[in-house]
Design a protein with these regions (language model features):
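Alpha-helical substrate-recognition element adjacent to the catalytic core
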Residues: 2-71
Length: 71
């Protein structure tokens, strides 16, 4: 029996969305849907970004509105 849990660590700017720093670009819908599906299958998804403070909150809120949550 394997206890392996896949972990996806994804960057925000230029990966989950087009790079428009300090704003937020268009979503990478294909990747976001892939991560949502993997998470429903038990994978862990981590946001790996250099955004901090209000810019980090904006990024997390943006992802949540698109249905992507993080572990």
């Amino acid at each position: 029996m394997s206890s392996f849990v896949p972990i996806y660590a994804v960057d925000f700017d230029g990966t989950l969305c087009e790079s428009k720093w300090p704003g937020i670009g268009a979503p990478n819908k294909k990747l976001i849907q892939h991560l949502i599906q993997r998470r429903t299958e038990g994978a862990k998804v981590i946001l790996w970004t250099c955004r901090v403070e209000e810019h980090l909150k904006e990024a997390v809120d943006w992802c949540c509105k698109l249905g992507l949550e993080f572990d």
